[in-house]
Amino acid sequence: MIRSHERQAVAKATQPIVDREPIRSMKPGLALAALGIVFGDIGTSVLYSLQTVFSMENHAVRPTHGDVMGIISMIFWSILLVVCVKYVIFVMRADNDGEGGILALMALVRRLMASHKGTGMTALLLGIVGAGLFYGDSFITPAISVMSAVEGLTVANPDAEKIVLPASVVILTLLFIVQRRGTEVIGKAFGPVMATWFLTLAALGIPWIIHHPVIITALSPHWAILFSIERPAMAFIAMGAVVLTITGAEALYADMGHVGAPSIRLAWFGLVLPCLLINYLGQGAMILSHPDWIDNPFFRMAPDWATIPLVTIATMATVIASQAVISGAFSMSSEAARLGLLPRLGVRHTSKSEGGQIYIPEVNWTLFIGVLALILIFQTSSKLATAYGLAVTGTFLLTTSLFLVLAHRAWHWPMWALIFFGVIVGGVELSIFSANLLKIASGGWIPLLFATIVVIIMTTWRRGTAYIAKQRQDDEGPLDDFLNWMHETKPTRVPGLAVYPHPGRATTPLALLNNLRFNHVLHEHNIIISIVVENVPHVRHVNRIEKVDLGRPTDGITYIACHVGFTDSQDVPKALALAAAKCPWLKDHLDEAIYYLSLVDVKRDEPQQGAHMAGWRKMLYITMSRNQADRTRVFRIPRTRAVVMGEAVAL
């Protein structure tokens, strides 16, 4: 959380229309919920991290005393600096109205830097790239997590190797199929299951630590330093696998809005961190005792009779981790669409009580196809690990960059503190990122490809939308001119209420112009309503409605701006119901309102006229524009009372 003087600095940059919601208190119940929502990714990394370290580059890192102690030391200090210091202690204090994640941080920085156009655009670009990298990792996490759990069967029976691939495909297929029904019922069990999982991790590690207590000395940083000095090339390569132990760090920040920062900190320091460290120390102690068990050190920690139960709970934990990633992709996509970075999406709410539980078919099936392709291409978790890490370390660096801007501009950190944080934390992250560059040729290019596609889509949509908005303004003309024309012509009036959703109050809605052009009538009451998305996650109901009477009192034209956060619904009928407090006459007309939607049919212009955008990007924008979600669904408008009118605009 942000300290009082820091929160005041942030509040100065907040628009008056926006109020902060109460911050959640630290409750054990929320901490238990956090185990199921937040810690799935980082909690299941124990399955494949050390296995990957000792399998990279044809087993270049050996299970010797020095190498094992060095690796465990690197893991401990990476978790301590990146997860504990950076995210849990500092970054999670940079909440945007209680929400976290790189898009929320980007929106917060842009609001702070509103008067610095160049810095604001840089923050926007960093946010877009960070979102792209997040999507790149979203394809890998479900695949590597589930496969690594199912591979535990091969420890009990080597012949089970042939069922790992089909079993993983079946589990993930079922997971993506059930998304449309939501996880409200089974989601209540996620916290207890993950609590059991973390206690199991500790139970597996303790006996091996007792058997080989020297492993505890690996917590000293001198082992990592010694390993780096004696075998610098191997230490650099190992950093590419050590990152697997912290890949879920960004989730702690991104999911902060669900359960609150205090609950995440309580769960992290109270259970997750101790259990993870005990398990990693236990795996290290076991490898010191049995160097030949590096093929699957996690499952080899358990006695033979416990292998099948361990595979079962590991599979449950990885499914929960995958569910968290999928839900995160849904949430980020919804936020990106409301921030104008993606087209309108068909968001479906899967819970009547939890507004954050949503389902987006386009995102769900895109993820499923990508995850399935990765499983079929790589076929084992160890091979898939070679593609994992580059995108997430890129996200680490981008989050650090945005955080330092916030710390400097809003919290007024002294320069020495900024440099110290940047050198220590940023230096570790830059080293890990550099090590992961070695993975590009062996599969690391795949998440980068996914990320690049997302960045192209977001930048194309934003640029195309800005151009179309300018063209649309020229076609619509100033609203003041329309009001003057209306006074002169005095069009025929008909009873009822006409509602015109429209981006702003400066111009005349196309649907209003066309309604007069073709029907030659104007309703008795007319409302032009704009959904204004603020750079905050939530706007309280009491602060949402801004009402302006246009023209003369007898004109019957009212402008309403409904301010919402980028995680709030864009429900137009609900906004009108809120506006009734400021428009008493509105209550009697809500049930009979007719909604006139302005449709802009984007067409490609002549090649010589289109220097503002490449031809292929125009086609991409037009395709997205024509296939985006129906606005009646996005605005929750009854289809039986919706009329669509508009015209073509050249891109």
UniProtKB/Swiss-Prot annotation:
<keyword id="KW-0812">Transmembrane</keyword>
<keyword id="KW-0633">Potassium transport</keyword>
<keyword id="KW-0769">Symport</keyword>
<feature type="transmembrane region" description="Helical">
    <location>
        <begin position="124"/>
        <end position="144"/>
    </location>
</feature>
<dbReference type="Pfam" id="PF22776">
    <property type="entry name" value="K_trans_C"/>
</dbReference>
<feature type="transmembrane region" description="Helical">
    <location>
        <begin position="387"/>
        <end position="407"/>
    </location>
</feature>
<keyword id="KW-0406">Ion transport</keyword>
<keyword id="KW-0630">Potassium</keyword>
<feature type="transmembrane region" description="Helical">
    <location>
        <begin position="71"/>
        <end position="91"/>
    </location>
</feature>
<dbReference type="InterPro" id="IPR053951">
    <property type="entry name" value="K_trans_N"/>
</dbReference>
<dbReference type="InterPro" id="IPR053952">
    <property type="entry name" value="K_trans_C"/>
</dbReference>
<feature type="transmembrane region" description="Helical">
    <location>
        <begin position="358"/>
        <end position="378"/>
    </location>
</feature>
<protein>
    <recommendedName>
        <fullName>Probable potassium transport system protein Kup</fullName>
    </recommendedName>
</protein>
<keyword id="KW-0813">Transport</keyword>
<dbReference type="Pfam" id="PF02705">
    <property type="entry name" value="K_trans"/>
</dbReference>
<dbReference type="InterPro" id="IPR023051">
    <property type="entry name" value="Kup"/>
</dbReference>
<feature type="transmembrane region" description="Helical">
    <location>
        <begin position="268"/>
        <end position="288"/>
    </location>
</feature>
<feature type="transmembrane region" description="Helical">
    <location>
        <begin position="190"/>
        <end position="210"/>
    </location>
</feature>
<dbReference type="GO" id="GO:0005886">
    <property type="term" value="C:plasma membrane"/>
</dbReference>
<comment type="similarity">
    <text>Belongs to the HAK/KUP transporter (TC 2.A.72) family.</text>
</comment>
<dbReference type="GO" id="GO:0015293">
    <property type="term" value="F:symporter activity"/>
</dbReference>
<keyword id="KW-1003">Cell membrane</keyword>
<comment type="function">
    <text>Transport of potassium into the cell. Likely operates as a K(+):H(+) symporter.</text>
</comment>
<dbReference type="InterPro" id="IPR003855">
    <property type="entry name" value="K+_transporter"/>
</dbReference>
<feature type="transmembrane region" description="Helical">
    <location>
        <begin position="413"/>
        <end position="433"/>
    </location>
</feature>
<feature type="transmembrane region" description="Helical">
    <location>
        <begin position="310"/>
        <end position="330"/>
    </location>
</feature>
<keyword id="KW-0472">Membrane</keyword>
<feature type="transmembrane region" description="Helical">
    <location>
        <begin position="158"/>
        <end position="178"/>
    </location>
</feature>
<feature type="transmembrane region" description="Helical">
    <location>
        <begin position="233"/>
        <end position="253"/>
    </location>
</feature>
<feature type="transmembrane region" description="Helical">
    <location>
        <begin position="437"/>
        <end position="457"/>
    </location>
</feature>
<dbReference type="GO" id="GO:0015079">
    <property type="term" value="F:potassium ion transmembrane transporter activity"/>
</dbReference>
<feature type="transmembrane region" description="Helical">
    <location>
        <begin position="30"/>
        <end position="50"/>
    </location>
</feature>
<keyword id="KW-1133">Transmembrane helix</keyword>
